[in-house]
Amino acid sequence: MNNFSIISAYKPAGGQPKAIDEIIAGLNSKKRSQMLLGITGSGKTFTMANIIERTNRPTLIMAHNKTLAAQIYLEMKSIFPKNAVEYFVSYYDYYQPEAYIVRTDTFIEKDSSINEQIDLMRHSATRSLLERRDVIVIASVSCIYGLGAPDLYYQMTVHLELGQSYPRDKLLNDLINLQYKRNDIGFERGCFRVKGDHIDIFPSHYSDKAWRLSFFGNELEYIHEFDPLTGEKLTQLDKAMVFGNSHFVMPQKTINNAISSIEVELQKHLDVLKSQDKLIEAKRLNQRTQYDLEMLTETGSCKGIENYSRFFTGRNAGEPPPTLFEYLPKDALLFLDESHVSIPQIRAMYNSDRARKEVLVEHGFRLPSALDNRPLKFEEWEKFRPQTVFVSATPGPFELEETGGTVVELIIRPTGLLDPECIIKPATNQVEDLISEIQTTITKGLRILVTTLTKKMAEDLTSYLQDLQYKTYYLHSNIHTLERIEILRDLRQGNIDILVGINLLREGIDIPECGLVAILDADKEGFLRSEVSLIQTIGRAARNSRGKVILYADKMTKSIDKAVSETLRRRQIQQEYNKKYGIIPKTINSAIHTLESLEEIHDNKLDKKQTNTLLNNPAKLKSYMDKLKKEMFKAASNLEFEQAAKLRNQLKTLEKAVLELS
């Protein structure tokens, strides 16, 4: 059995050793739920890594969005280089679900763009879970959506072993049943090709490795792993396992049974629609479903096959769909990061999906069984989740109820950094006072974050500060994700001194250069000025030893009182620790990632300006990457392997940039 092995120059420090011991003790005593209260800069990811290493259990880490999931994935990948660290998020770059607008009688067809790199990583994740135990999967909350059943996914594999007999026609047919395509010219992921007594397979979970099978008659003599671009042999294998090119592959018998069940449901629902005098809806449903049935019969797949998933998995109406949780071993461990945000998201996902599909069913676009192609209900997720550690600086009511209010605190930072000093000032003339504070902070070479209550106030304040010649930017919800990260990078580099926002300056923003966080109208109770929001916003100044927070308020609200009191409590604990061990607080100097640092873009004749333009325009990016891919294969076919390798590196650079900046 493979063991987890941390490769790091650091050892647990600060509050980490105590937190690790307490969480592990709780796991060993079979506690189903624990709460890790980890503040900004305390080393939550490293703490989770040490818990994983010591318990040696397969682990799922859930984050509330792709950006945070990618951040954790990259960190875990560097901590566990010898183990399987996987990334499982939605593979759509763009997704428009099918919908029907009754008021205008408008049907919106499903439209999507699949990210091949993320699809590859999803296949790699499920494969690792089925083949080994030293696996850490970092997923977004979208992992509670339906996925192909693990038993069917594993059943639909081709096992290859040296010395065994594989009739050629049967092997090729098996690969086609796994939805691999034969392509003797353009060899890419999810394809196979045949040359004499060789069969080359490009597995769905690899981007830069393929397998060459060499036969003597029907006997498998060699399995070589090779570079599909240059043809260079990498290693020799004794055996290999080919998984499906889709999570929805299934045996022909299952497809035939499903077709029969779909036909039965179709007839029943047509009778229902006709009894309601919905003749147009009945005709529409019959046409759409019959077309899907023909495609399933002829090809084993159809567009929107996931809407019939209940029939393929053998589940009854209303039963939960198979998800990533069914791929987890029974002794798996779950970390739910930023649980105060993730829990409400999990609660909401089912209802929003259900409302859209009920309209489709009612108007004859889908069968009622489409309602079972859905995310898990919260109660189902609660049932399926394994032993869980909730992780948050501000635990929500669900986590506290589940853990009986008991939390494991991780509030001592190894760096000695204190929680920022919180100063409360009158909201009257808050802008004039803010300008004075801004000037003082900029003089120190530090940056400023300002959070307002309304969009109009943020816009007006930004314009006002810009008129005063301050380098100010307004961070709002309409800004594209990649542009948002560029803005934050400009802030860290000093191209921007002040960032103004509403609800965007909370979880996951790492700005060690931040010396001041100003919270305007802090006494206006509500979502944006709740205890949780205030603590999260205050935390943005916790990565700099000179960081401070000013709350502009004319009255003391319960939220301000609790947030400031909690910050003061944490500050005092850190001060005592620093005094005891003679630690001088040091600002966290994390690297400012530039596009050049992702890979040597200039070596491939793609400058930063070009890269930024591409990354901020998904359509152009996809077109450019498709062009690069064609040029790469053309160079390889012309035996220009050096040029092909350069083009491949450039493709990898862009793919990695998209992942890190997504």
UniProtKB/Swiss-Prot annotation:
Gene Ontology, cellular component aspect: cytoplasm; excinuclease repair complex
Subcellular location: Cytoplasm
Pfam families: Helicase_C, ResIII, UVR, UvrB, UvrB_inter
Residue window of motif Beta-hairpin: 91-114
GO molecular-function term, one example from the UniProt record: ATP hydrolysis activity
Domain Helicase C-terminal positions: 430-592
Keywords: ATP-binding, Cytoplasm, DNA damage, DNA excision, DNA repair, Excision nuclease, Nucleotide-binding, SOS response
Domain Helicase ATP-binding residues, every copy: 25-414
Domain UVR: 622-657
Subunit: Forms a heterotetramer with UvrA during the search for lesions. Interacts with UvrC in an incision complex.
Protein name: UvrABC system protein B
Protein source organism: Rickettsia typhi (strain ATCC VR-144 / Wilmington)
